[in-house]
């Protein structure tokens, strides 16, 4: 029975905490929890524990918060727990080879894509950004490479035209624990069937940046609409008006050709703010000026119509 496995859990954000909660709710034997050190947060910069630490302490589990797992004394913390397997979900620290080899069944990771597509830091966002029809989670055996280990289990889900990174995150946070629990049972039973990743299908999910999220009107309307969903809730697509950043929460594509230069405002009315792009027209529907709440294009036009005069160009 998989419940008899001695499991170390390593993770940090809410996504990881949901996996730990699922393990505990299904009766698995978690013998120790590793998570990142408390970080300053909020205006007061008060030290705040990670969601994983909060849950682990609520459940009375031993918690370890090393800054790194490279020092010998920190690796000994792992060794002393005599785990059968280490489950790693968005931990945020590199596991050295020595640590990867400590548990009897090695270390397994829950990754937010259908590997080998979107190895790396931002798989959820990049799947939206690229216009993928589906994504999912992969449970893999960890090795020293970046998401290069053998795949143990996959679950997929469709990406809808309304999905943002936020909604997709929630979907994968439901799928991941299901896949993890199934994989642990297979490891315990000896029925797991590792599958080598096809190197010809590898793509990399590079980190996001605030600068990348600035709207580039030379791109197509379809690409920009995907970017707006991919970068929501972070870093949020934005444009600059009168030296102020204005976030864009929602937009749609108008499939009409235009000869206007990219960035040219074509219309500004209750249907939205229509802007020419490198290919097609992007209709801005929901925006957020600096220091304000998100609002409809109509509400923004009521107070800032001078920002969106047809014929003017957005930078």
Curated annotation (Swiss-Prot):
Q: What does this protein do?
A: Attaches a formyl group to the free amino group of methionyl-tRNA(fMet). The formyl group appears to play a dual role in the initiator identity of N-formylmethionyl-tRNA by promoting its recognition by IF2 and preventing the misappropriation of this tRNA by the elongation apparatus.
Name of the protein described by the UniProt record: Methionyl-tRNA formyltransferase
Query: What is the name of the gene encoding this protein?
Result: fmt
Any one Gene Ontology MF annotation carried by this entry is:
methionyl-tRNA formyltransferase activity
Under the heading HAMAP family, the entry gives: Formyl_trans
Gene3D superfamilies per the record? Formyl transferase, C-terminal domain, Formyl transferase, N-terminal domain
- Superkingdom in the source lineage: Bacteria
**NCBIfam families given in the database record:** fmt (TIGR00460)
Q: Name the family.
A: Belongs to the Fmt family.
Which residue windows are coiled coil?
A: none
The record ties this protein, via Pfam families, to: Formyl_trans_C, Formyl_trans_N
Sorted alphabetically, which keywords does the UniProt record give?
A: Protein biosynthesis, Transferase
